[in-house]
Amino acid sequence: MTQSWQTIPEMVLSAADRFGDAEAVVDGPLRLSFTELVTRIRCAAGAFAEHGIQKGDRVAVWAPNSAEWIIAAFGLLTAGAVLVPVNTRFKTEEAADVIGRSGAKAVLVQQGFLGQDYAAPAGVPVIDLKSDFLSSGSPFKQDVSGLTGTDISDIIFTSGTTGRPKGARMNHRQTLRMYEEWATLADLREGDRYLMINPYFHTFGLKAGLIASFLRGATMLPVAAFDIVRVVELVEAERITMLPGPPTLYHSLLAVPDKGKLATLRAGVTGAADIPVELVRRIHDELPFQTLMTGYGLTEAGNVTLSRPGDSFEDVATTAGLPCEDIDVRIADDGEVLVRGYGVMQGYLDDPAATAEAIDGEGWLHTGDLGAFTPSGRLRIVGRKKDMFIVGGFNAYPAEIEGFLLEHPAVAQAAVIGVPDARLGQVGKAFVVVNAGKSAVTSDELIAWSRDRMAGFKVPRFVEFIDALPLNATGKVMKDRLR
C-alpha cells in the first residue's frame, strides 16, 4: 500500500476522520473512540507546548502500558518532540543514565507501578501520567510543529556488549512504512481488538502495537503487567482478536482449561526466542488462531524478516521468514547477519564511533547475530555473535550483567550465558570465581543481591562457582566451554 503520510502525528491525527466513533482504546473503565482519543492527544500536545517543549526536544516516558502512555507519547510527537521510551524494569540508576544521556526535557512516569517510585536525574521535570497534566493544554493544531518525514521520531535505547545502553534513532517516514508492511503480513484489520502485553517501551509494543493499530483502526487494549488469568478474562470479555506475545504466552494459553474463553482469537505473532515445531503445531490444533506470524528484527533496524501467510509449521518455528520489502539481508563470511535498507536506524545518539562500528561504509548494519538462509530463502538465526540471550522476550546482555556482578565484593570474575528454560525460553546462568580474601557468598545470596540492583530479566537464575574461567590466548572468556 502506498501511504501518503510523512509523519506519525499526521497519520495518528487522521485516525479521527478515518475511524471516527469506532472504539480506539479500552483501559479498565476508560473507553475512547478514535475521535475522542485524537482530541486528548491534541490537548496533550498543547500541554507539552505550553510546558516549553519544542520541535526536536526529547521527552522520556518511563511507565507501564496504559491509555495515558498512548496519549502522552503521541501528544509529545504531535508537539514535534522526540519520544524516548524507558524500560519499566530498569532500576532508578539504570533509568537515570538513559534519561540523562538522552537530554530529555521532561520525564513522564506512573508513580507506584511495581512498587517503585520513579525519579529522574536532577533538573529534569517529572510529570505523573495519572495527574491532570495531559488534559491541561489547549488543543494543538495540526502541522504547527513543522515536522517532516526525515525528522527523528523516537530514540529507543538498546544495550551493546559493552553493557552501556545506546540510543537508536528512527525517523517518522521509515517507521510508518515499516509497520504498514508489518500490519499487512500480521493480518491486522480495521475493527480488530488488539490485547497489548508487549511493553510500549519496546519497539514491538510501540510500533507493531500502537503505530500499527492507528494505521489499521484496531482497538488498543493496554496490559500493564502480564497475568495469564487476567489475559484470559480480557480475551473473553473484550472479544480479543489479535494477541501477539513471546512463546511463553502461547504456552500459557495452551494450559488454559476452558479453551472456549479464547474463541475470538484470530491472529497471533511471536518471535524473540526459539520455538519448537510442536508448539506451533499445538497452537494451530488446540487454539483458535488462524494465523501465526514470526519474524526477526532489532531496535537498530525494526523488521528485517517476517514469515508469510501459508508458511508451514516448520518454517514458522525454525525460521524468521523472508526479508521485508526493500530490505537487503546477507550473511557475512563469519556468519553474521548484515542488514541494509530504509529501515536501518539514523545512527546512535551522540555516539558516532558506535554508529561507525555498527554500520559500515556500504550501509550494512552489522547485527551481531549469526544466521543462515534456508534453500527457500528464509532466514534462520543460529546464534548470537555478541552472546545476547532472550528472557521471556527481553534482551539480556551478558557483559552488562557481568559488570553488575563484579560490583559484589566477593566476586573476582564472572561470566554469564543463557541456558534453556521451559517457560521463558532462556535465563541467565553466572559462572563466578570468588575473591580469595573476601568472605564467602552463596548462590542464593548473590542472586538476591542481584535482584536489588538490576531488572528482573537480567538476574541470573543459576550461579555456579568455579576455580577459574576458561580463557583464550588473548584473555577472553571462551563461553562455548561453559555451555
Model-derived features with residue positions:
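AMP-binding/adenylate-forming catalytic core of the ANL superfamily
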Residues: F90-E93, V107, V235, L243, ...
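Conserved ANL (AMP-binding/adenylate-forming) active-site segment centered on the GW(Y/F)…HTG consensus within
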Residues: F313-A317, L322, V344-G368, T374, ...
